[in-house]
Regions:
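A binding-site-centric feature that preferentially detects glycan-recognition modules on secreted/surface proteins
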Residues: 1-78, 82-149
Length: 149
């Protein structure tokens, strides 16, 4: 079930959260720009805190494999944003000293950049990577995390 609560407080922007991760472990992102300047998410805490529920899993949802961000949007499936995924990483790391998505990749289909590409997060080697996929990309490793608002 959906038993992992993620609370997004005001001020928790993509770059703020990425910086918090960078203070705890190695990180990499696809751009030198501030993530706050390039990320557009379905939900933000700009108007106040909110909460979502995710499945409590290390790897992104098996149920979401081979489904592109565009298909997710067409089917109106609610999935985590980049902010929510990074918050989950921080929470999981503080609880376990381990990382999420060590074998798979979370497609953050609740977020886009200005040109419409979709962020993803994974643990690769010794770093948390924030990368990008085209909205039509789909494969077995790339999976969104379904969310309940």
């Amino acid at each position: 079930g959906f038993d992992r609560l993620i609370i997004v407080a005001p001020g928790m922007t993509p770059q703020v959260l990425f910086n918090k991760c960078s203070g705890l472990f190695k990180t990499w992102k696809y751009t030198n720009k501030d993530l706050d300047e390039v990320i557009i998410s379905d939900r933000t805490p700009a108007k106040g805190a909110y909460a979502i529920w995710l499945r409590d899993r290390i790897e992104a949802d098996e149920e979401m494999k081979n489904i592109s961000a565009n298909q997710i949007k067409q089917q109106q499936i609610i999935t985590c944003t980049l902010e929510e995924r990074i918050l989950y990483e921080l929470k999981y790391f503080k609880e376990t000293n381990q990382h999420l998505d060590v074998q798979k990749i979370t497609l953050c289909a609740g977020s886009r950049n200005q040109s419409g590409v979709v962020p993803n997060v994974r643990w690769y080697g010794s770093k948390m990577f924030v990368g990008w996929y085209n909205p039509d990309d789909q494969d077995d490793l790339l999976r969104a995390r379904a969310a309940v608002i």
